[in-house]
């Protein structure tokens, strides 16, 4: 659990997301409240529930990115789902309880990785012994083993091919599900049973693999680390992490709104909302790893609400999403900042990609302004897809260079207004063309 202050959280989010200060402040406070709750006594801690958030704003303005970056900062189990992927209980499809099951699986992976890091030193020593055994043989004298150990640590044996026996983690039936009783087995989905999990339980299989010494280390360290981990402890920690600090991001919540004058198929969407109610309010969900209480999981719902309005959500669901945050549409100036100020700016990405072909790319201020202007213009005249438009525009600008870069090794390319005009000019002048190409 992160102990960052709200100001530090917002500052961290500013590195990747431009603007949207209201949304950043709301999620920063929600995350800090997690830490505050942990400082309380046991009697009061269970009474403090998270204040769930509803983000309202057009596509491509940073709703999903804010939540994703927040989860990384919090070092918390996180899952992003689309509300439209789920169906009402009783219908064919995934029910909303699958969200929590997937969150538990994500937590298992996260906790296992963290625990592997803790035992990495021991696992490294054990892996080294296994490599020496493969090189020198099981019955080798200590003197011989020491000689191999010195060569191994000096990197002299990195290209030597050895044969190793490692745990077989493959799961050929992993995605194979068969119908079962409603409610599923061990908390699978409704009426679904995962054959892969059943056979995985039998486990213990090993496979022989031929690898170079250098390539074998990562595999062996992972194998040895897993031997040092206690599966029961991993599961227990994962369930606790989900219950106490899990974050669920539900996108496209506006797509399951039934408009007030709707009839027929639209009305069935309310079923998904009704199923979400107990999940967000607090219920116990059965999973294959054990029961999970959802009382203290933070839910962040988001939607563009172009057609439906937040008031079209079920009143009970509105009440369970008490914090409303409006995200504004992005402007040309925002696009300039996105291309220059963020740590993961597209300009830096393209410069680095071209550098692998020994082509030096430099963006001028005028070039960046031209890219931002075109993106804003097309958003206005065609369809506003926010910052995602920048991907389309830059990909189009670099289309020719990306193709010819291997033949231009050693060249220097300046992306200025002329370069942008040369690669995009015709398209931007023709609305019909930009409608289909950009």
Swiss-Prot record:
HAMAP family hit by this protein: HslU
Subunit (UniProt): A double ring-shaped homohexamer of HslV is capped on each side by a ring-shaped HslU homohexamer. The assembly of the HslU/HslV complex is dependent on binding of ATP.
Domain of life: Bacteria
Binding site for ATP: 18, 60-65, 251, 316, 388
PANTHER family: ATP-DEPENDENT CLP PROTEASE ATP-BINDING SUBUNIT CLPX-LIKE, MITOCHONDRIAL-RELATED, ATP-DEPENDENT PROTEASE ATPASE SUBUNIT HSLU
UniProt name for this protein: ATP-dependent protease ATPase subunit HslU
Gene3D superfamilies: 1.10.8.60, DNA helicase RuvA subunit, C-terminal domain (1.10.8.10), P-loop containing nucleotide triphosphate hydrolases (3.40.50.300)
Subcellular location: Cytoplasm
Keywords: ATP-binding, Chaperone, Cytoplasm, Nucleotide-binding, Stress response
Annotated function: ATPase subunit of a proteasome-like degradation complex; this subunit has chaperone activity. The binding of ATP and its subsequent hydrolysis by HslU are essential for unfolding of protein substrates subsequently hydrolyzed by HslV. HslU recognizes the N-terminal part of its protein substrates and unfolds these before they are guided to HslV for hydrolysis.
Classification via SMART domains: AAA, ClpB_D2-small
Organism (species): Jannaschia sp. (strain CCS1)
Primary subcellular site in the record, as a coarse category: cytoplasm
Gene Ontology CC, one term: HslUV protease complex
A GO molecular-function annotation: proteasome-activating activity
Family note: Belongs to the ClpX chaperone family. HslU subfamily.
InterPro entries hit by this protein: AAA+_ATPase (IPR003593), ATP-dep_Clp_protease_ClpX (IPR050052), ATPase_AAA_core (IPR003959), Clp_ATPase_C (IPR019489), HslU (IPR004491), P-loop_NTPase (IPR027417)
One biological process term in Gene Ontology: protein unfolding
């Amino acid at each position: 659990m992160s102990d960052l202050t709200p100001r530090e959280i917002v500052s961290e989010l500013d590195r990747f997301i431009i603007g949207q200060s209201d949304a950043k402040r709301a999620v920063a406070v929600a995350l800090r409240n997690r830490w505050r709750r942990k400082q309380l006594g046991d009697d009061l801690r269970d009474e403090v529930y998270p204040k769930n958030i509803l983000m309202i704003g057009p596509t491509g303005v940073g709703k999903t990115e804010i939540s994703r970056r927040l989860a990384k900062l919090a070092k918390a189990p996180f899952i992003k789902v689309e509300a439209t992927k789920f169906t009402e209980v009783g219908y064919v499809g995934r029910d909303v309880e699958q969200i929590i099951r997937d969150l538990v699986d994500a937590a298992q992976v996260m906790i296992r990785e963290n625990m592997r890091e803790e035992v990495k030193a021991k696992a490294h020593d054990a892996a080294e012994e296994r490599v020496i055994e493969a090189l020198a043989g099981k019955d080798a004298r200590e003197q011989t083993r020491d000689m191999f150990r010195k060569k191994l640590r000096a990197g002299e044996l990195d290209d030597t091919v050895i044969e190793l026996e490692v745990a077989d983690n493959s799961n050929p039936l992993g995605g194979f599900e068969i119908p079962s009783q409603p409610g599923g087995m061990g908390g699978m989905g409704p009426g679904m049973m995962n054959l892969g999990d059943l056979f995985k339980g039998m486990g213990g299989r090993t496979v022989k693999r031929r690898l170079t010494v250098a390539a074998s280390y990562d595999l062996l360290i992972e194998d040895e680390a897993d031997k040092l981990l206690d599966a029961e402890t991993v599961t227990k920690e994962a369930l606790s992490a989900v219950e106490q600090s899990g974050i669920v991001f539900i996108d496209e919540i506006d797509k399951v709104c039934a408009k007030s004058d709707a009839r027929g198929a639209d009305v069935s969407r309310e079923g998904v909302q009704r199923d979400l109610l107990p999940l967000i309010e607090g219920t116990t969900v059965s999973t294959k790893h054990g029961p999970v209480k959802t009382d203290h999981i933070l839910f962040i719902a988001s939607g563009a609400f172009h057609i439906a309005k937040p008031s079209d959500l079920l009143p009970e669901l509105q009440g369970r999403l008490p914090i409303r945050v409006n995200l504004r549409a992005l402007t040309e100036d925002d696009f300039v900042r996105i291309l220059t100020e963020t740590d993961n700016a597209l300009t830096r990405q393209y410069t680095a990609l071209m550098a692998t072909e020994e082509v030096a790319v430099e963006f001028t201020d005028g070039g960046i302004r031209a890219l931002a202007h075109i993106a804003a213009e097309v958003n206005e005249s065609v369809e506003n897809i926010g910052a995602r438009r920048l991907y389309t525009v830059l990909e189009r600008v670099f289309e020719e260079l990306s193709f010819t870069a291997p033949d231009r090794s050693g060249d220097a390319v300046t992306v200025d207004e002329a370069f942008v005009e040369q690669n995009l000019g015709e398209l931007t002048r023709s609305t019909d063309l930009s409608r289909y190409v950009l």
